[in-house]
């Protein structure tokens, strides 16, 4: 029977279940609550403020879906305008 499976193009139930689970996990990981996203934003800004001056009002941090090798995966995208670099000799 295994000889016939080599020529079969139908995925096994195991592979179908695995693919479905991947899709569910990717979807769940990409859904961040506003509270979690705000915490991430504050921590990123706290670290960056040690090294550069930034405009907090102009910061845009979002979660998007990007195409990866195996479907879509979530990506954290940050647009943070820098006013000045701290400690830079002029």
From Swiss-Prot:
InterPro entries: MinE, MinE_sf. Keywords: Cell cycle, Cell division. It holds the Pfam family MinE. Signal peptide: none annotated. It comes from the Bacteria. One of its GO terms (biological process) is regulation of division septum assembly. HAMAP family: MinE. Prevents the cell division inhibition by proteins MinC and MinD at internal division sites while permitting inhibition at polar sites. This ensures cell division at the proper site by restricting the formation of a division septum at the midpoint of the long axis of the cell. Belongs to the MinE family. This is Cell division topological specificity factor. It comes from Clostridium perfringens (strain SM101 / Type A). The lineage of its organism: Bacteria, Bacillati, Bacillota, Clostridia, Eubacteriales.
